[in-house]
Curated annotation (Swiss-Prot):
Gene3D superfamilies: Cytochrome b5-like heme/steroid binding domain (3.10.120.10). Keywords: Electron transport, Endoplasmic reticulum, Fatty acid biosynthesis, Fatty acid metabolism, Lipid biosynthesis, Lipid metabolism, Membrane, Oxidoreductase, Transmembrane, Transmembrane helix, Transport. This is Fatty acid desaturase 3. PANTHER family: FATTY ACID DESATURASE 2, FATTY ACID DESATURASE 3. It comes from Homo sapiens. A 28 kDa isoform is expressed in lung, kidney, pancreas and ovary (at protein level). It catalyses: an N-acylsphing-4-enine + 2 Fe(II)-[cytochrome b5] + O2 + 2 H(+) = an N-acyl-sphinga-4E,14Z-dienine + 2 Fe(III)-[cytochrome b5] + 2 H2O; N-(hexanoyl)sphing-4-enine + 2 Fe(II)-[cytochrome b5] + O2 + 2 H(+) = N-hexanoyl-sphinga-4E,14Z-dienine + 2 Fe(III)-[cytochrome b5] + 2 H2O; sphing-4-enine + 2 Fe(II)-[cytochrome b5] + O2 + 2 H(+) = sphinga-4E,14Z-dienine + 2 Fe(III)-[cytochrome b5] + 2 H2O; (11E)-octadecenoyl-CoA + 2 Fe(II)-[cytochrome b5] + O2 + 2 H(+) = (11E,13Z)-octadecadienoyl-CoA + 2 Fe(III)-[cytochrome b5] + 2 H2O. Pathway: Lipid metabolism; sphingolipid metabolism; Lipid metabolism; polyunsaturated fatty acid biosynthesis. Belongs to the fatty acid desaturase type 1 family. Highly expressed in various organs and tissues including liver, kidney, brain, lung, pancreas, testis, ovary and skeletal muscle (at protein level). Residues 1-133, 181-263, 328-445 are cytoplasmic. The protein sequence includes a number of characteristic features of microsomal fatty acid desaturases including the three histidine boxes (these domains may contain the active site and/or be involved in metal ion binding), and the N-terminal cytochrome b5 domain containing the heme-binding motif, HPGG, similar to that of other fatty acid desaturases. It is a multi-pass membrane protein. A motif (Histidine box-1) lies at residues 182-186.
Amino acid sequence: MGGVGEPGPREGPAQPGAPLPTFCWEQIRAHDQPGDKWLVIERRVYDISRWAQRHPGGSRLIGHHGAEDATDAFRAFHQDLNFVRKFLQPLLIGELAPEEPSQDGPLNAQLVEDFRALHQAAEDMKLFDASPTFFAFLLGHILAMEVLAWLLIYLLGPGWVPSALAAFILAISQAQSWCLQHDLGHASIFKKSWWNHVAQKFVMGQLKGFSAHWWNFRHFQHHAKPNIFHKDPDVTVAPVFLLGESSVEYGKKKRRYLPYNQQHLYFFLIGPPLLTLVNFEVENLAYMLVCMQWADLLWAASFYARFFLSYLPFYGVPGVLLFFVAVRVLESHWFVWITQMNHIPKEIGHEKHRDWVSSQLAATCNVEPSLFTNWFSGHLNFQIEHHLFPRMPRHNYSRVAPLVKSLCAKHGLSYEVKPFLTALVDIVRSLKKSGDIWLDAYLHQ
């Protein structure tokens, strides 16, 4: 093994049949810079520096695991591991030295081992196999609501009451479409990735007017590094809102771009109403243009063409624009409350390089299940199970939950489950707490 701090081989991948060079973690830690990234998977060391831009999930996603053991993330995100390993082989430059632990940083080796055994048990129980009937029903009820909304206006006219009912129904349809495209993005429905990708483009593009690539770019980072600043886009929201550790940091630096001690109040004005209508619409369009996602742009255009051609004859241009805004605002409320109730009240801060299980549990909690909550949240009330097993079809979360709860009990880890309304209120409480922490640091530190 080379001396500590030596950069290791850079001339190319390990030669087939030749003994693999060995590395210690101190050497690997030196390779977590832009343009110089190593990572470890199954104790093998890979140089992804030049290949990261070709990574299907994006260079940021794989780069977030620089100089880390990415074994559990690798297994969590990919369907066909043997197929993906073919792409890793040319990047192989060595392996961990025998005396090195499998993971750098805070590590509970027994927890990692037990989780991998649990993952295998879930596979043996066929919990990664989707129910075609379940997902066909989901798509069917989305399409039925789209038709029902149009029929209301067609049969009853564009009065205030039919329009309000139609907007409400379309908002539900849009919310459920978020859930279905989310399932497809995680490749949890079809056995072949290609079919998941194609179906996601249809649901995200034709039914919602957004880019599947854009969603996956954001969402996979969130799953890889939940609640980690500058790695999880969902919590990198300063200077509009301050969350977790950013509250103290902004306070100490005397930054006051907004009255953060009142952020739990202005959240109701610019959070739930405007996220989808303003932030997502602008960010999504910019992503498609900058990243030249022309196919996604065409899919999104097909949604707008269908929507406006369907309702323009009833409302005219000003009316159909107002109707569209109403649907987006209603949908946005659903999206914010449902997606944030499991994360915002949890630990939010900078990278701590934890193992997969510990990092996911620190950032997530569950909400008590019921038929309504399961449907309304797209089963995101089982957020712990979803984050540990992102490819698992959501109808199987309840089956794996007792096993996850037992794992947490064995290792003294928190398995938090809240009532639905408590989870919603905790979002506001968390924002107020962060604002108060900012104010105290601003005035006294």
